[in-house]
Amino acid sequence: MSAASLYPVRPEVAATTLTDEATYKAMYQQSVVNPDGFWREQAQRLDWIKPFSVVKQTSFDDHRVDIKWFADGTLNVAYNCLDRHLAERGDTIAIIWEGDDPSEHREITYRELHEEVCKFANALRGQDVHRGDVVTIYMPMIPEAVVAMLACARIGAIHSVVFGGFSPEALAGRIIDCSSKVVITADEGLRGGKKTALKANVDRALTNPETSSVQKVIVCKRTGGEIEWNRHRDIWYHALLEVASSTCAPKEMGAEESLFILYTSGSTGKPKGVLHTTAGYLLYAALTHERVFDYKPGEIYWCTADVGWVTGHSYIVYGPLANGATTLLFEGVPNYPDITRVSKIIDKHKVNILYTAPTAIRAMMAEGTKSVEGADGSSLRLLGSVGEPINPEAWGWYYNTVGKQNCPIVDTWWQTETGGILISPLPGATALKPGSATRPFFGVIPALVDNLGNLIEGAAEGNLVILDSWPGQSRTLYGDHDRFVDTYFKTFRGMYFTGDGARRDEDGYYWITGRVDDVLNVSGHRMGTAEIESAMVAHPKVAEAAVVGVPHDLKGQGIYVYVTLNAGEEPSDALRTELRNWVRKEIGPIASPDFIQWAPGLPKTRSGKIMRRILRKIATAEYDALGDISTLADPGVVQHLIETHKSMSAA
């Protein structure tokens, strides 16, 4: 390994860090040798109503997968994120909200946030929402979205946040799956100067007869735009708050009671409702937030994710607020009104820690130094990356141009299902290698296995698995425990299968190589190929579709679709555009195909399985690396696809 690619821990970071290398090694060792003792001690960072006596009861045996942490303890998540901070830091800023328009921002103290959460919790109770009921939150990035999440947690309701970029059809599917009782939305969202019709999307979603579980729609006024109103069903958020009491006792919740459901893409098409519970999740989010970001009281922390994704749940809301941090909530996008927006926000709010995605970094990098022109940036102390592996080139640009070579980068690897960061450098303990997620967090035991499930030792490449449970782990898929077991524990028995491939180097550092299943990673967001294929095939002119990921300069992975049309249908540029718009409507803009190639037939095995491996190679013009195609039902299809791809590339 060349010395140039290693960035040792900076002495000034090591001097002030919460976790230096010796501490990391000692704590990690204890966490894997004596998990009960380690997590019993760490759990003291939470305020318990009834202390737990048992720490860890977990089994990865695929006949009885069962995950419980601190099972007999009770507590309340909202109390841990709000009430317990009031005496010491009630007047500390909890949330800095930065609007889409740079002229708009708000600062909300812990005391103010606590009051609004209590009022809205009472308002929800007034709408017959109680412990165990599911509430769908389909909101822009405004403080009321965080209020809604914490209000649910306060009364023991389960929230299901759906990203505001999802279509009415996708929203309806996520409402139906969890029999949601109430939907909370806004009249419109604002993002990059454009309005999104959130309330209209909810109205459309609720025309689906299977969404009849929804009794009320609570609407927050964001733009004041024209919306349709159903006076039997719709209620204004502000009207509810005006009459609500600001006193609301937090509900005593069991450690293993449900906190939230978050839908993530699966390889079979139907989105999976990942279920997280109360104590283990909160403890893990708080501990990882403190240690990975080396968070110190009074610092300004900005995670650029959307609350509709797990990163927003764990590292905008629950982790930072449990730690009494100041968390920045940004409504807009990194390039609006122009590409300097991120640096301007950093300077305006004196941001110390920036946690963003490689997609945003690549978008800024594409503009050279323009994105940091006129910026000071001296408040920054630490940079983070999340959502997909960051390529070394983007890492170097982020380190040199945004961090001015003064800020360590924590390149974090984790998933919706893991609740929090599993593999990441700790800034005061880990020498950095651009592109590597480096070492496991406390209590996390990663391993590599071959395709037969045999453990591979030393420097090697293989399937990434985790050998034992950690408190932030998802407990099940909502209403479908069999699918949970099949997806994560059947492939490699007795292990949690991440769906990712990884390489381990001679220093024991992990390098994530990408998905090994049929899931794409577009701009840091997971999307199942089956979900896009299903949407495409639902179009009346399409007979069959196959989706593969291809490298994309900005998004990381682009969406490449092979389409077979029904007999009698003619391919055309107009139809290409129509199909793109169709997928946008079915799933959302995020799933819009980057490339559509017409395919008279697809390469299939004799059993009818589409050979995606071949399609991936053709899409990236690796025509000589197709491997053995003699087993295909019709090998002639391949040459035709290659010719079409060549003519597309030439055009």
Curated annotation (Swiss-Prot):
CDD domains: ACS
Positions contributing to ATP binding: 387-389, 411-416, 500, 515, 526
EC number: 6.2.1.1
Keywords: Acetylation, ATP-binding, Ligase, Magnesium, Metal-binding, Nucleotide-binding
Key word Acetylation present: yes
N6-acetyllysine modified-residue sites: 609
GO-annotated biological processes: acetyl-CoA biosynthetic process from acetate
Any one Gene Ontology molecular-function term assigned to this protein's record: ATP binding
Catalysed reactions, semicolon-separated: acetate + ATP + CoA = acetyl-CoA + AMP + diphosphate
Cofactor(s) listed in the protein's UniProt record: Mg(2+)
Family label: Belongs to the ATP-dependent AMP-binding enzyme family.
Free-text function comment from the UniProt entry: Catalyzes the conversion of acetate into acetyl-CoA (AcCoA), an essential intermediate at the junction of anabolic and catabolic pathways. AcsA undergoes a two-step reaction. In the first half reaction, AcsA combines acetate with ATP to form acetyl-adenylate (AcAMP) intermediate. In the second half reaction, it can then transfer the acetyl group from AcAMP to the sulfhydryl group of CoA, forming the product AcCoA.
Protein name: Acetyl-coenzyme A synthetase
